[in-house]
Structures are given as C-alpha cells and as structure tokens.
C-alpha cells in the first residue's frame, strides 16, 4: 500500500534494533476506598484511606519489525494499560520503553506520525459526522498529501467493502461497521506500528472474520509491527504466531502457539465414536480420565503413551471413528490464568526474550 515513490521522511529504526523494547515497565495507581453508609462516607471526606493497585508489574518485552503479537489475558490483566504506555497516553511508575526508537510518553511529532492505536470501546471517529468527514480531518492532522490520502483511503475502503457507509453518520452504524471504519481511519497515515486493543469485542462471527482477513492482509502487505490485545482465542489463532499471556500485570508466557501446547500439557485428547454406548466399567479399566457422551468416549492420554495404548483401545471397543487432538488453546490458557503458572516460559521470571 505504501508507494515507494513517496518515501517517508521519518528516520528509520537503526538496523538490528527492535521496533519495540520494554524493560521493567510498571504502572501503579493510587485508589481511594469508598466506605459504605452515609456517616462513613462523610467521615471518609476528612480521613480518606487509599491503596496502591499494580496494573503492570515489571514487564520485559522485545518486538521485531513485522511481528504480529497477541497479548492475551482476562479483564484487568494489564493489557490496555500496556498499550496506553506504549502509545504515550500515560507515563510509567518505573521502567523504560522505546517504540521506533522514541520514548512514547515524550509524544514527539515524529513518533505520533508513525504509530496508530485502535481501541474497541473508544471512538476516534466523530459521532455525529459521516466517516468521510473524519477521514478528511485525519488527513489534515497527519499532513497527508491529497494523492496519497485518496489512494490509501480508496484501497482500505474497498478492502473492507465500506464505501456505502462513508456518508452515513457514525452514530447510525452497527458496531461491526463502525469498527471497520475506525480501522480505515487508523491506517490512513500508513503507520509503521499498530496497537489494537480488543478490536473484535462485541462483534458477531461474520464481522470478526472480516476483520481477521483484513488485518492479516494489511499487516503482511505493509510489514507493520502489530500488538493485539484480546481475550478471544479466535483472534490469536487467526492472526498471530507469537502469543504473550498476561495476568495480574505480569507475563506468564511468551512464545509460539505451538510451543504453548507442548510446554503446558502432557496429554492429548482421544475421541472415540463407538457403535453403541460403552460399558462404563470397561472404560474405567483403561485407566485414563474420561468423559462419556452416549456412544462417544473422550479420553485424556499421556502424549508419550498414545502409540502404545491406542491399538488396544481400538480392538476392544467397537470403534467407528477416532480422532487424536491437542488440548484446545482456550483450555490451556484458562488453566494458566487459574494457576498463575509460569512453567515453560523462556525465562525464569516469566518475562522472556
């Protein structure tokens, strides 16, 4: 999408340097407790009690040019705080970060022209105006020359098939339609780094799939560096090769999707479709955790024993069909959240790379 005949004037990141580098980044907030009851509330006006909340706890992260990284975690894990820090919206309590060689919270003009932030629950489009008007305002803010603006706008609009929406007030659009136009606005100035904060939240399956295809295409073509925060595994599986799992402000895992299965599970799921509902006692004698659903049996078998035990199971049960699968990623990550486990990360602290 970027026309090589119109090169950027921004200084590139030095060769060998990561696009994003974060070291010991932490953010703390002081919150005031609100006592219950009228008298307690009045007393609290003169004797306010506060406590410190750690939104981010000494995070280390290194992201190279062209990586598409998913940051997965439950609500309150620190994902949005992390993106706000990298965007320069807030400043850290301690630690350091550079994005494209700049310190984000210094908010230099050069830095602001080279990244974009899209938040699924925040609008950057003017609510009462058509998106086309917001796009023109965006053009002036980022000083995009007219030929480049029109070329980029038309390409993005056609990719998302939203041309018919451009003249409708944003308030009249569905959530999915609005999010598509938010992405167009964010990409008009052709940023090198894109931060996406839960862009698919609240969207139906069709809208999610459309955004997945668009983001995969644009990221590959532009070689943008992207960090996507989400709590949907579908976003991760569709878009990212690298996964960062966070909870309570700390990194539990940083690595590939394939590695997380090997490191955090020791078994596979074997599903047997039988001719008839099985004898429970016979299934229990197999000695594996199991679930029976009519004529279907679901076993959890140690991955190192599959080849040894599966032939015997198939001979004795009247099996019509069998499948062997890894434990679903959703289940693995949910267990990580419950246990707070850092086993299997690339570093001793759970903050690899």
Regions from the language model: what does each represent?
Residues 190:
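Conserved catalytic motifs of ABC-family nucleotide-binding domains
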Residues 194-198:
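Catalytic Walker B motif of ABC-type/P-loop ATPase nucleotide-binding domains
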Residues 128, 169-173:
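Conserved ABC ATPase signature
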Residues 212-300:
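ABC transporter nucleotide-binding domain
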Residues 37-44, 136, 140, 147-165:
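Conserved ABC ATPase "signature" region
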Residues 2, 269-340:
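Short, charged/small-residue-rich alpha-helical element at the C-terminal edge
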């Amino acid at each position: 999408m970027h026309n090589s005949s119109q090169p950027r004037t921004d200084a590139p990141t030095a060769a060998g340097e990561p696009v994003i580098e974060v070291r010991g980044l932490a953010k703390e907030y002081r919150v005031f407790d609100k006592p219950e009851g009228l008298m307690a509330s009045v007393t609290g006006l003169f004797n306010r009690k506060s406590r410190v909340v750690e939104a981010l706890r000494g995070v280390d992260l290194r992201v190279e040019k062209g990586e598409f990284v998913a940051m997965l975690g439950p609500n309150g894990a620190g994902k949005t705080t992390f993106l706000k820090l990298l965007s320069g919206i807030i400043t850290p309590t301690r630690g350091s970060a550079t994005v494209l060689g700049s310190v984000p919270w210094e908010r230099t003009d050069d830095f602001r022209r080279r990244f974009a932030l899209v938040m699924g629950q925040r609008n950057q489009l003017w609510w009462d105006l058509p998106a086309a008007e917001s796009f023109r305002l965006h053009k002036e803010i980022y000083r995009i020359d007219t030929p480049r603006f029109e070329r980029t706008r038309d390409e993005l609009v056609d990719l998302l098939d939203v041309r018919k929406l451009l003249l409708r007030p944003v308030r009249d659009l569905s959530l999915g339609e609005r999010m598509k136009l938010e992405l167009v606005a964010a990409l008009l100035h052709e940023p090198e780094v894109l931060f996406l904060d839960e862009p698919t939240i609240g969207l139906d399956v069709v809208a999610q799939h459309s955004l997945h295809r668009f983001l995969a295409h644009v990221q590959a073509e532009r070689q943008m560096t992207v960090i996507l925060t989400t709590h949907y595994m579908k976003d991760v599986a569709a878009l990212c090769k690298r996964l960062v799992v966070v909870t309570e402000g700390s990194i539990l895992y940083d690595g590939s999707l394939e590695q997380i299965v090997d490191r955090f599970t020791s078994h596979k799921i074997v599903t047997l479709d039988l001719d008839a509902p099985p004898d429970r006692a016979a299934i229990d004698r197999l000695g594996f955790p199991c679930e029976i659903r009519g004529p279907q049996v679901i076993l959890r078998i140690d991955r190192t024993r599959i080849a040894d035990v599966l032939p015997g199971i198939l001979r004795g049960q009247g099996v019509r069909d069998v499948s062997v699968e890894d434990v679903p990623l959703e289940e693995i990550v949910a267990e990580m959240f419950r246990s707070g486990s850092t086993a299997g990360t690339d570093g001793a602290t759970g903050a690899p790379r």
